[in-house]
């Protein structure tokens, strides 16, 4: 059986972004340390203020450089809102 963690973070103002992002990084590290297999993130647009959700592929690429064993996935990806070439490049970053 495999277990995953779903990361989602919201802030009420840009001043909170650093704290929110650092908390998500810490959660991902703890998930890996505790033996979870994957971290999933949302790819939602225009749903309130969630700094990581605007481009979770970049955030996942950052986490991939920090973590060694865990896999990454997007829980929802709104493909029509992405340019096809840019989307392929973002996904390729994680390969």
Can you say where each PLM-predicted feature lies in the sequence?
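Glycine-rich anion/phosphate-binding loops
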Residues: 18-23, 80-93
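A short, terminal or domain-edge coil/loop segment
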Residues: 57-60, 90-95
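N-terminal beta1-alpha1-beta2 module of alpha/beta enzyme domains
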Residues: 1-66, 71
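Conserved strand-turn element in the central/C-terminal portion of the radical SAM core barrel
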Residues: 73-81
């Amino acid at each position: 059986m495999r277990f995953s963690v779903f990361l989602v973070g919201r802030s009420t103002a840009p001043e909170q972004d650093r704290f929110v992002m650092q908390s998500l990084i810490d959660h991902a590290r703890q998930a890996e340390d505790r033996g979870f297999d994957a971290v999933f993130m949302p790819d939602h647009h225009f749903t309130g203020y969630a700094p990581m959700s605007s481009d979770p592929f970049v955030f996942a690429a950052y986490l991939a450089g920090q973590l060694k064993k865990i896999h990454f996935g997007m829980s929802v990806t709104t493909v029509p809102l992405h340019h096809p070439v840019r989307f392929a490049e973002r996904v390729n970053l994680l390969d």
